[in-house]
Structure formats: structure tokens, C-alpha cells
UniProtKB/Swiss-Prot annotation:
Catalyzes the dehalogenation of halotyrosines such as 3,5-diiodo-L-tyrosine. Likely to also catalyze the dehalogenation of other halotyrosines such as 3-bromo-L-tyrosine, 3-chloro-L-tyrosine and 3-iodo-L-tyrosine. The lineage of its organism: Eukaryota, Metazoa, Cnidaria, Hydrozoa, Hydroidolina. FMN binds at R82, R83, S84, V85, R86, S110, G111, T219, S220, T221, R261. Gene3D superfamilies: NADH Oxidase. This is Iodotyrosine deiodinase. GO terms for molecular function: FMN binding; iodotyrosine deiodinase activity. It is found in: Membrane.
């Protein structure tokens, strides 16, 4: 039935066939590589979890029941006072405080102890202004075109828009990046297990440390600005931004929405 096909048609079919064969070959090669990697990991099941680490005795502090109840309630009251703040004082914060906050975030658990996070701290005013420029440019498009009217309407009670003064008002910006994979000394990719979950948990530690230090922050997710911010601060293609936090003291006239948190019986299911 191909008797009437021209030489051009035969050439086109041959090209398509060659492309399909190449794609199938690539797929088979990739599947074989993954299978070999899995087989290698299974033959050394503890190598990734405990890479030549020594084990040491561990005896954390133990408190009486009365002290545990008091400490847990005190911590709850402190964290319950935490609010997302959009109005910052430009008053400076000691660098050592920020260093300690980042150290605390770095104590977070991570898959196979890969610690797949990078905390970029920006104090430089010109760089903060550039961050604001990038985010406001994308946020205006988000509000006007990308988010949809329902999302915009849901944000109206919080009185938010694409203007982000806090990005230049707050003394510090902390950008948290997840490392989707690591790079070994010889330039090979290193698997970072559960990198998004691990980095997200570290963000929780970070927020708790900020609250504990007597500072405030705003948890923001720079929608559609991630690659520009990554390039701005010189991070590699293996890193993706998770959250951006302006950090500092609240302004004297700071106000926050009068929001209420869900009671315990709405967030906990308990089996005694």
C-alpha cells in the first residue's frame, strides 16, 4: 500500500522510525540504570542511612511529669502568640541572633541525614530591593492573571496585594532552599531522600526559633519567582526555594487579623 509514496515520504518514515528506536533505547538504558542503582543500594542497605557514622550514648534531659506539663504548656503559649506579620520596624537585629536561629533550623531531622537545605540570609539593602522588585513583578501577574478570582477574593480579608513593602522594611530576609539532590566531591549527583519534607520540617524549626528569640516573620511563598531568586543569590539548579521569610521586630503600629485557631478537638484524633 506504500507503492505510491515518494522518496521523501520513505525518508520521513525512516526518520520517524529511527527516532522511535532511539527513544526506546534511551528508556531501556534509563530503566537499567535505575535498576542497577536500586540493586546496589539493596546490597548495602545501611550505607545510605548510616554512612560510616559512629554511635554514641544518648541521654536527653528527663523531667518530672509536673515539669513536663509546665514546659509543654509554656512552649504552647509562646507559639500560640506567634503571628504572621506584614509590618516591620527597620530596627537592626544582632547578627548572632540570626546565626543562632539558622543553627536551630539546621538541627531538623532529614532523610538519611542528608540535610538538604540552604538558608540564604540577606541583610544588604540593595539586594533586598532587588528581591522585592522580582517578587512584586511576578505577584502583580499572579493577582491579575494567574490566581483566579476566588483565590484573590479569599485573600481580601487579610488585605494582601502584590505590593510587598515588608521585603525592604524588615532588617533580614531568609530564603529557604531545598536541595533536590547533592553534588559529591567528584561532581556526581547524590540522592537527597525526602528533600521537600525534610526542608519543610526545618522551616518549622526556623519559625519556632524566630518566635523564641522575640522576633516576628511572615511566611511567604514567592509564586513563579523561584528561578529568578535562585539566580539572584547564586544557587545551583539543584536548589528550589521553599519559603521566604522577612524577619525582624514588628512596627510600632503593627496590626494583625483577629484570627482564631482551631481547638484541640478539631485537630487531634486520639486512641487511648
Amino acid at each position: 500500500m506504500f507503492d505510491n509514496l515518494s522518496g521523501v515520504s520513505y525518508g520521513l518514515l525512516a526518520g520517524i522510525l529511527a527516532m522511535l528506536i532511539h527513544l526506546v533505547y534511551q528508556k531501556i538504558t534509563e530503566l537499567k540504570r535505575r535498576k542497577d542503582e536500586l540493586k546496589e543500594r539493596e546490597s548495602h542497605p545501611t550505607d545510605d542511612l548510616f554512612p560510616k557514622e559512629d554511635f554514641i550514648p544518648y541521654h536527653p534531659s528527663r523531667y518530672s511529669e509536673e515539669e513536663m506539663i509546665k514546659r509543654s504548656n509554656d512552649f504552647y503559649l509562646s507559639m500560640n502568640a506567634r503571628r504572621s506579620v506584614r509590618f516591620f520596624s527597620n530596627e537592626d537585629v544582632p547578627d548572632e541572633v540570626i546565626d543562632n536561629i539558622i543553627r536551630t533550623a539546621g538541627t531538623s531531622p532529614s532523610g538519611a541525614h542528608t540535610e538538604p537545605w540552604t538558608f540564604v540570609v540577606i541583610k544588604n539593602k540593595l539586594l533586598k530591593a532587588k528581591v522585592r522588585e522580582i517578587i512584586e513583578e511576578e505577584e502583580e501577574l499572579n493577582y491579575k492573571q494567574r490566581m483566579g478570582q476566588k483565590w484573590v477574593d479569599d485573600l481580601k480579608p487579610l488585605k494582601t496585594n502584590w505590593i510587598k513593602e515588608y521585603l525592604t522594611e524588615a532588617p533580614y530576609l531568609i530564603l529557604v532552599f531545598k536541595q533536590t539532590y547533592g553534588i559529591t566531591e567528584d561532581g556526581q549527583k547524590k540522592t537527597h531522600y525526602y528533600n521537600e519534607i525534610s526542608a519543610s520540617i526545618s522551616c518549622g524549626f526556623l519559625l519556632a526559633a524566630i518566635q523564641n528569640a522575640g522576633l516576628v516573620a511572615l511566611t511567604s511563598t514567592p509564586l513563579n519567582a523561584g528561578s529568578k531568586l535562585r539566580n539572584l543569590v547564586g544557587r545551583g539548579p539543584n536548589e528550589k526555594i521553599v519559603i521566604l521569610l522577612p524577619v525582624g521586630y514588628p512596627s510600632k503600629n503593627c496590626q494583625v487579623p483577629n484570627l482564631k485557631r482551631k481547638p484541640l478537638n478539631e485537630i487531634m484524633i486520639k486512641f487511648d
